[in-house]
């Protein structure tokens, strides 16, 4: 019996790695940031060359989130809606699948004291809207998985989280 009937796992190149400006705690960025459409084109090239079959992203890697317009992805004429369609067309053309969609609560200063576990109900609502947007974007791209990344969501900073108020 031949078990090697094609790819058994996806080789993936995520948006955040391709778009990294190469900064770390020891120094600032050494590269300029790429636009998400340019990153998609690099990922598509890697797919066409046979290096990868899939990609993943944090929502903010594709289109920045604006708490004043938390459902901008639903408006096809919005900058976010247009950019998402452009990125999808580039990836689809190269046959690159989206493996996982990840919400970047950890990357937004608004959620520094937690997102879904923030003691402030207004902040929790915004975090939920951001997660819902990421789920919609993932569905749009046909993502197989959604990752809830709890980094900096308050659980690892018990000193700033008022646990008795978390679920009020």
PLM features per residue range, with description:
Residues 1-140:
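N-terminal pre-domain/capping segments
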Residues 103-114, 143-165:
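Active-site-proximal loop/short-helix segments
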Residues 168:
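Active-site cradle of extracellular carbohydrate-active enzymes
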């Amino acid at each position: 019996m031949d078990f090697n009937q094609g790819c058994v796992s996806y080789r993936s190149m995520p948006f955040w790695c391709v778009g990294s400006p190469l900064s770390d705690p020891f120094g600032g960025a050494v590269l300029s940031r790429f636009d998400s459409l340019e990153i998609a084109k690099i990922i598509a090239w890697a797919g066409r060359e046979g290096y990868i079959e899939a990609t993943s992203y944090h929502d903010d890697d594709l289109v920045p989130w604006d708490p004043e317009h938390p459902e901008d992805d639903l408006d096809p004429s919005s900058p976010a809606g247009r950019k998402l369609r452009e990125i999808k067309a580039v990836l689809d053309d190269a046959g690159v699948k989206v493996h996982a969609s990840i919400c970047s609560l950890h990357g937004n200063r608004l959620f520094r004291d937690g997102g879904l576990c923030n003691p402030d109900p207004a902040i929790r609502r915004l975090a939920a809207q951001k997660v819902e947007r990421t789920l919609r974007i993932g569905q749009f791209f046909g993502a197989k998985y959604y990752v809830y990344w709890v980094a900096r969501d308050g659980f690892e900073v018990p000193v700033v989280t008022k646990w008795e108020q978390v679920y009020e």
